[in-house]
């Protein structure tokens, strides 16, 4: 069960597969929000804290296999610490938290990608986050072939998830689109469009809320 949204800040998350342009849009959105005079905390999962950086190194760069349930628990541990020490305090101060990946990533990557029970992964994530849901989740959607081409042009080395087979990434994308059937929280954006068009659509959705 989620906690009611009765906080002074605004919690925005960016989701989508690898190579869809989350970091680019996060940077543009941060610049726009700062221009409006809002205090912004830009962060990410995993890796938004010192502890999270260590967990990120394990889940993305450790050699060898990690059991799917162990992987899900590591992400949940990162989330619990990150929400308690970074996200909630910022929201309580009335700031905008702009975050690259959150619990929907766990449902898509560990639930669908790793073929775990998506409902259990979601409940684990909500427990770790004490029920905290974003005010808006921006899902950047892009077909896997284009996303992989973008990623390949920007990387010399793939992390553990990026290196998974195409079937894995197809399951992840399908899971994201299924999650986005929650229209009050999600904005689904066609990430094949020009960067500035995408940024304008995101700003339009936020107009009046910031």
Curated annotation (Swiss-Prot):
Q: Which PANTHER family match?
A: THYMIDYLATE KINASE, UMP-CMP KINASE 2, MITOCHONDRIAL
- GO CC annotations? cytosol
What single Pfam family name could you report for this chain, choosing any that match? Thymidylate_kin
What the entry lists under InterPro entries is as follows: P-loop_NTPase (IPR027417), Thymidylate_kin-like_dom (IPR039430), Thymidylate_kinase (IPR018094)
Write the protein's name. Thymidylate kinase
Q: Which UniProt keywords apply?
A: ATP-binding, Kinase, Nucleotide biosynthesis, Nucleotide-binding, Transferase
Any single GO molecular-function term of the entry would be: dTMP kinase activity
Q: Which reaction does it catalyse?
A: dTMP + ATP = dTDP + ADP
Gene3D superfamilies reported for this sequence: P-loop containing nucleotide triphosphate hydrolases (3.40.50.300)
- What EC number(s) are associated with this protein in UniProt? 2.7.4.9
Q: Which species is this UniProt entry from?
A: Leifsonia xyli subsp. xyli (strain CTCB07)
The record's comment on protein family reads: Belongs to the thymidylate kinase family.
> What processes in GO biological process is this protein linked to?
dTDP biosynthetic process; dTTP biosynthetic process; dUDP biosynthetic process
The record's function comment reads: Phosphorylation of dTMP to form dTDP in both de novo and salvage pathways of dTTP synthesis.
